[in-house]
Swiss-Prot record:
Species per Swiss-Prot/TrEMBL record: Candida albicans
Subcellular location: Cell membrane; Secreted, Cell wall
10 X 36 AA tandem repeats: region residues: 433-792
UniProt-recorded name of the protein: Agglutinin-like protein 1
Function field: Major cell surface adhesion protein which mediates both yeast-to-host tissue adherence and yeast aggregation. Acts as a downstream effector of the EFG1 regulatory pathway. Required for rapamycin-induced aggregation of C.albicans. Binds glycans and mediates adherence to endothelial and epithelial cells, thereby playing an important role in the pathogenesis of C.albicans infections.
Pfam family name, one: Candida_ALS_N
Amino acid sequence: MLQQFTLLFLYLSIASAKTITGVFDSFNSLTWSNAANYAFKGPGYPTWNAVLGWSLDGTSANPGDTFTLNMPCVFKYTTSQTSVDLTADGVKYATCQFYSGEEFTTFSTLTCTVNDALKSSIKAFGTVTLPIAFNVGGTGSSTDLEDSKCFTAGTNTVTFNDGDKDISIDVEFEKSTVDPSAYLYASRVMPSLNKVTTLFVAPQCENGYTSGTMGFSSSNGDVAIDCSNIHIGITKGLNDWNYPVSSESFSYTKTCTSNGIQIKYQNVPAGYRPFIDAYISATDVNQYTLAYTNDYTCAGSRSQSKPFTLRWTGYKNSDAGSNGIVIVATTRTVTDSTTAVTTLPFNPSVDKTKTIEILQPIPTTTITTSYVGVTTSYSTKTAPIGETATVIVDVPYHTTTTVTSEWTGTITTTTTRTNPTDSIDTVVVQVPSPNPTVSTTEYWSQSFATTTTVTAPPGGTDTVIIREPPNHTVTTTEYWSQSFATTTTVTAPPGGTDSVIIREPPNPTVTTTEYWSQSFATTTTVTAPPGGTDSVIIREPPNPTVTTTEYWSQSYATTTTVTAPPGGTDSVIIREPPNHTVTTTEYWSQSYATTTTVTAPPGGTDTVIIREPPNHTVTTTEYWSQSFATTTTVTGPPSGTDTVIIREPPNPTVTTTEYWSQSYATTTTITAPPGETDTVLIREPPNHTVTTTEYWSQSYATTTTVTAPPGETDTVLIREPPNHTVTTTEYWSQSYATTTTVTAPPGGTDTVIIREPPNPTVTTTEYWSQSFATTTTVTAPPGGTDTVIIYESMSSSKISTSSNDITSIIPSFSRPHYVNSTTSDLSTFESSSMNTPTSISSDGMLLSSTTLVTESETTTESICSDGKECSRLSSSSGIVTNPDSNESSIVTSTVPTASTMSDSLSSTDGISATSSDNVSKSGVSVTTETSVTTIQTTPNPLSSSVTSLTQLSSIPSVSESESKVTFTSNGDNQSGTHDSQSTSTEIEIVTTSSTKVLPPVVSSNTDLTSEPTNTREQPTTLSTTSNSITEDITTSQPTGDNGDNTSSTNPVPTVATSTLASASEEDNKSGSHESASTSLKPSMGENSGLTTSTEIEATTTSPTEAPSPAVSSGTDVTTEPTDTREQPTTLSTTSKTNSESVATTQATNENGGKSPSTDLTSSLTTGTSASTSANSELVTSGSVTGGAVASASNDQSHSTSVTNSNSIVSNTPQTTLSQQVTSSSPSTNTFIASTYDGSGSIIQHSTWLYGLITLLSLFI
């Protein structure tokens, strides 16, 4: 019972809901807010805010009632909301749904439903704000073409309606500021589809177009073109906002993919402009980019190609809102004939509720009746207060009679003639006179039948063509008693089945027994094809069966039978997929939608029933092949729009050919509106495509499709920017170099592989302070020389050396490294005395005292690359001893002059590579000139007889060495095509020293005679203290800003070094000191910022005793007895060195011009002067004896027996690691000899190793 009452109440509620009108009663304002920086106040640009007044009276409106506001020429609501409430004093009295017209209808609607809050005693009113955008065109659709004529620039009247209630307001619309003769473009967002409509109109050609290509595409993959929703046409005019107001067909060729659409057209008449629009889907409809193709040739003009790219952004939505006050009405019935209204006191600034007392007359009920007649009559039945009076309205209606006649026209017409004096109207129907008909039946290749009526003009003969598919054929094979076969065909009428009867002789037979599902047994004979074997199948009743049905995850059903032995029970397992669902949508009379699901058994189909309220209706007129008109209604999806299709007689035809994705050709006719021209669209299968990829000079890729005529081959031309190139240099086993380029796919990186033959190798042995040996290989660039550095541990062996023969190395390394080297000399003194007997035919003894000196030299090198990581390398070497009587001579070969020059190209990653033509160069050019005079020493003169002391004075005692090093740096032009001028740094080192050489050895067959000699041995002391000179040379290059040559600065610093020392017999350990300074002060140019100062202080004290001469081979020497006291000899050397830093700055031009160089030339001259005194005789060869004082100046040719103990280490950047530079400079305790190994490589040896090799060679 309760359920029945509930259903009854629901039915009554639905039945009582009605449509009301006039709720929206005023158009208060219409203002524009710029939602996206638009250039002008156009009607189509968001957001137009419409403020409307509304009122709801509870006496005439009930909950559930509906009312609708129609808004012509409104495209959409520019808000993310889907509804707005009509609110007064915070109470929602109605809810309104937004329905945007967009591309579907020429208007938008606001459909509202009254809420339960509205009572019969309440009258609510207020305002609602609606954010909207108007439709003034934008595509070639029929909706946009109609709305393109809604408004004009200037003052317009906007009118909305609620039923029969119109509300209006005047508004000012601004005209577009875009030049209408240029190319035009537009985009609009359709929120309901989340798509965008995009329009492109070709530039204006006053005399028409000869040809052109237009379209748009996206290469980013964030935009997809909807090829099923496009409009292509030519328009004869534009409205004030540059949108087409008409669309006509023309001949073109279309190409459309999801990435873009393009058309090619020809011969467009004067006064028309081609346009194209399409729906596009974007990853973000508020931000996307399109590239437009814009090629056209105006009649009588040259071809134009003006492509462009646009980045589209969205607008900001607005919100809808409502507010108002509440009126409470009280009603009192009176006997008056009219209604009176009394309003109680009300303050609108304080009160939210207004109370109105309504004095109304006795209510009446109207009963409407009808009758066949002409006039309307009224009658009233009165009633007292508290009851209801009745008004009876009798409304006449007319009956009709239909008269049908034939006429000569081609369509049927219907005319109703209303009789003003009688109740019978006449309907006149005129139909075309029918033609006679001829029917033709024929067969065709399709599988279905068609009937086509070809209508002739009035008075002619219509033809009905019936096309039938071929008859089906049934073949029957039977056996007969004959031994041969026959075939008979029985032909049936069209639409029937032909029979083919084959008669065969009988086959042999095989019998099979099986089970089946029936409860009885059968025997079946299966006849095989002629010549085969027939089968006799005996079927037995089956076992009882148990069937199980279950669901599984697959999309198909299976049945599995598990057969039990005879007498058992078989199992049938049925596996079913989940049921399919069929959705049925239907319409009903309610204003809301419902969804009901009806579940079917397994294997069936579930049904979802969706009930929707009725759709809006759009009427479309089209043409067809008949000579008469018809009307068809196409029902759209729920909430969509139903379409009423009116078919009209055909229009003239224009044929257009285009390509599509199928392999066959089709012809489609596009029917234009009545009186216009239909389009026949011929779709051809796509041509074969040949794709060609080539590189060009631009930095972006393009794809161009050259479309050939149907049946030929299209060409796709892909232009790619050149790939980046990575060059790799490697070594291989061949003796020649090769260069191979590996080309990567477009967008990749090409690889240039340079294969070089292996470099020659130079091996250098050095000594360091560690207890183990290591080997390090420094690989030079191709064409250079690799260096193998062997670090050996220090040895305690006593090796003969001459302290006056020293060689230092200017280390080599490759730019852009920066090297800091420090050389430390730590001397350790070990003294021992030896008495060596010498047979001189006398009983006297000549004794020799030897002081052994051991020196340890430690070198620390710090290498930093581009200011990043730094590495430190330390090494120490050097053991110096004075040879005894058993040690042999050390002979050094004269080293010829060595000159080495190289250039290097410094790449961005710090790798040095040999430069080639047309490549900017930078680097250091090093030229070394070295000459060394042979030094020959002999064993201790005390170990053999001496024939004559006077021979000693004639022995040469000068060893000279000169070294000149020149560094030249080519400029670095970073972005130009020309070499920069060079920077040259020239350092000249001139060293003069004198060396006392022992006399020659007396050969073994010499007869020596000597008088007895008494000798007193005196101690000999050698003391050495040495510091180091560290020279840093840094090259950099200033930068020019604009590619022009930077002015050069040529500071020419000069470095001069001099050393003055003196010594006396009384003070053998500390001599007098004078300091000499070296300064480097370049002249200051425009770009110069370099000042370098170097001070070198050296003090040398070198008392030296000249030894006795030795008797040469084959000489008879006689000497008188001599009493000789050997004087103590002390050699003391002190050297102090400061650091020298030379910096060269070279200009760099950032933008491609030449940069003049900065030329920095340094000249370093080192000289040695000394004075010595000793208690010995003066020797004319340049040694100091006998208390006389001899001095030496900075003259290379002058020699003294003074040892210069300066040690210079030059840190100079060089171009290649393979470059070995050897120069001679003074050093006290270190001797490094350089020899050639026969192949051009230089082998460097430390002093003690060279001495050891020489000593071993004497014994061998």
